[in-house]
Amino acid sequence: MQLSNNFLWGGATADFQFEGAYQEDGRGLSTHDYETDGSVQHPRCNTFKTADGQFGELPSSFFAPDPLPDGAEPCLYEDRYYPSHKAVDHYHRYKEDIALLAGMGMNVYRFSICWSRIFPTGDELEPNEAG
């Protein structure tokens, strides 16, 4: 099959799955940063610390909010793996990644940026340009 010369061939990426660099250039934390890895046998979880200092985790749900217990705050555990923290490190390797896409003949690329890169706490009046 012959494609026309103006055919757009491309790809797309999502910040959580691709970006990495979760604490660089003033980026704030988002709910996905507290989501662990998982498998069929052990689903992804959101980790937290209760008001009385107890650590806990609840299974993550893509389609519903993940409410934490009253008074609990999201918390990162040193012994857990959080995929979004490094991901595939597109934040540092974007030039190489785009060159790879171009090398495959792609001529368009759609990507998303984590909102907490631009507005680290969500309360800023001006965007974080470094993010």
Say what each PLM segment does.
Residues 1-131:
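Non-catalytic accessory regions flanking glycosidase/transglycosidase catalytic cores in CAZymes
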